[in-house]
């Protein structure tokens, strides 16, 4: 069982939803990222999505775009991100790390070299925003060769035929984008999320995480009542942006603890995965 | 050469093109593919498109023999395909008319566009006014400054211009922002991409609408000169005017096709936009193509005196035509383009856009190496009125 499976299987036995934060590697600087990852695990997260900064983050809103720009000021490269994961792994063997980013830094490194180095660094999954399943056959083969899970996005507009296609390719978990638009937007319809998740579960046999538009404890709890994992990105990145260096770990830690508390307080959990 | 039938069903030109977008955009693109597939074969749609090109755009655009300039250069004869005479002053309108007609049939009431030089923005605002649609144009704030006149033109036409302050504040950032708008408002919104880049079906669809340039040229050359030109020359930013001219000629292998990119301050400096000449393949803005990028795959800011060529990618069909050797790609500096701008003004009484001046500058280099009976057909893709301030500034004059 790999790290991602272990985490979800433990959570299932505890009847809990996973808390997945997103941070951009190198934001605000490379020295902070590994410390921040350890802080996140201490504050109770189950898996970390680590953003690979890119110059043109088309699917992200202004908050995450700015975090990318901050990281790129320090010239953080994909190689640097992998080094951060390796550094994190020296102290932490159990928390899965999923890289999330855009295709071109991986294209520049080459599939083969990337998956080998990612595997060596202790990366557990990779989500490439602009590799939809149609363009992913070779990419997924390379990932699976190295035992890395290909994570895919599903959206409110994904038709059933594509859900089936994603179900065949995806491993680890799938990431349901709970609203139309970019990261950091805010108009989440819980009714929609519930009905869409039950449709997805007809085909998807692995855990389903929900992200985009989750900005407060109450929404996090409501999502936790419906999904297997709650992904929180822009809200955490905002906390990083607005914190002074000296308070950054404490501020993010406090925010994450409150979210953890909220999602563990969920009721009526009706997940029927596995 | 075997029959050229690219792209494939998923929009691939060899290894290039495709649909490299986030899941949230896929269903909108699928819908667009389906609708365009239907209407490209629909006689009534095509009839309306060509009627609009004739009566609204003013097509066909003539081929003009630049005789005095050719004599001065002392070699091949330079012929100009006069896209600058189109309504709104550039080739861009061929495409926006086509896409606006499609948007109407798809029941969309709002169109959005990205623009660099402002020509595509003006062409989009124009058709939005013509067909009674709401129009929002995204433009890098740097370009807003460089192209103040075009910004005002768009506003006069009723469009809302939104300056984009992220990244390098140029065309690529405007494109990112337009994609974001589309993802958010896909229900009532149609995204008019202005060039042959982006995810499938845009590179194919924009090419098809712009192919009127090459199709007319083939007929006009036959009628007026009794033969086809020895070479086609067109500037390449994203590459829509070049593909429009080249595409109908791909099967005619004795016609050379030359795409001219912006060498800016020189391709050995960091300040250029010569994507095919200096770049490496990668993925950006929905397609795999050549990109100007650093060794880590980050996109590098480009530079050109002409905002319309200032883009770090290029249409995937050009990437393919380069790799298979059917087309050649070269680069022209800011200075060479300016010299060609002035030459055309003085020798022919035609003020070319700075974008088109790159193609003219290469023609001026090539012509003297050829015989006097050889013919170079240059796509004069736009007129230069919009560039007046830039040209004056280069001469130390403030208007």
Curated annotation (Swiss-Prot), chain B:
EC numbers: 4.2.1.20
Reactions it catalyzes: (1S,2R)-1-C-(indol-3-yl)glycerol 3-phosphate + L-serine = D-glyceraldehyde 3-phosphate + L-tryptophan + H2O
Keyword annotations from UniProtKB, A to Z: Amino-acid biosynthesis, Aromatic amino acid biosynthesis, Lyase, Pyridoxal phosphate, Tryptophan biosynthesis
Gene3D superfamilies: 3.40.50.1100
UniProt pathway: Amino-acid biosynthesis; L-tryptophan biosynthesis; L-tryptophan from chorismate: step 5/5
InterPro entries (UniProt xref): Trp_synth_b_CS (IPR006653), Trp_synth_beta (IPR006654), Trp_synth_beta/beta-like (IPR023026), TrpB-like_PALP (IPR001926), TrpB-like_PALP_sf (IPR036052)
N6-(pyridoxal phosphate)lysine, modified sites: 92
Enzyme kind, highest EC tier: lyase
MF-aspect GO terms: tryptophan synthase activity
Cofactors required: pyridoxal 5'-phosphate
PROSITE patterns, sorted: TRP_SYNTHASE_BETA (PS00168)
Any one GO cellular component localisation term in the record: cytoplasm
Task of the protein: The beta subunit is responsible for the synthesis of L-tryptophan from indole and L-serine.
Assembly and oligomerization: Tetramer of two alpha and two beta chains.
Family to which this protein belongs: Belongs to the TrpB family.
Name of the protein in question: Tryptophan synthase beta chain
Organism whose genome encodes this protein: Nitrosomonas eutropha (strain DSM 101675 / C91 / Nm57)
